Amino acid sequence: MAREAKGPKEGDFITIKSYKHDGSLHRTWRDTMVLKTSENVLIGCNDHTLVTEDDGRRWVTREPAIVYFHKHYWFNIVAMIRDNGVSYYCNLASPYVLDKEALKYIDYDLDVKVFPDGERRLLDVDEYEEHGAQWRYSADTDRILKANVKVLVDWIKNKKGPFSQDYIDIWYSRYQELSRRQ
């Protein structure tokens, strides 16, 4: 008897769904190309990907972006490849789960934006505090998220993983190679 595939393979397209802590759907990305999967990591690429907001508004991403998700870290990383360099949008979020429908995670509002010149900004602190009170984030969740902000800032400072230009070059090149095969 043939073994059932364990999830998406390199070159497959998946949907990504982010939810809020209360379980409501926040945002959906259609057709993210999978570049790599391992036990704990999924790397993909969005390129002119359709995004649907919770209110039904739709828009298309403007540039290619390498996306990084991990099953143990409470953040995911979007590296947007632009003419003036790579910009990063890092979501503080639950580790992802992957099922037949989509890659899914809970978005916890806090974001770190990194500009091509290295400037960093922590965004949406007010939204995090508002939702934390509204949905009663536990003390453990708050502690874990704040600890993961520190991990994320350390990765940024040390150009670890997605924050390395070599990493971006390797995975964007792989995306281009797989796109030519489609």
Curated annotation (Swiss-Prot):
It is an enzyme of class 3 (hydrolase). It catalyses: a ribonucleoside 5'-triphosphate + H2O = a ribonucleoside 5'-diphosphate + phosphate + H(+); a ribonucleoside 5'-diphosphate + H2O = a ribonucleoside 5'-phosphate + phosphate + H(+). Mg(2+) 2 binds at residues 109, 111, 124, 127. Mg(2+) 1 binds at residues 91, 107, 111. The active site is at residue 27. Its cofactor is Mg(2+). Has nucleoside phosphatase activity towards nucleoside triphosphates and nucleoside diphosphates. The lineage of its organism: Bacteria, Bacillati, Bacillota, Bacilli, Lactobacillales. Belongs to the Ntdp family. Its EC number is 3.6.1.15, 3.6.1.6. It holds the Pfam family DUF402. The keyword DNA-binding does not apply. This is Nucleoside triphosphate/diphosphate phosphatase. Disulfide bonds: none annotated. InterPro entries: DUF402, FomD-like_sf, Ntdp-like, SA1684. Keywords: Hydrolase, Magnesium, Metal-binding. One of its GO terms (molecular function) is nucleoside diphosphate phosphatase activity. The keyword Metal-binding applies.
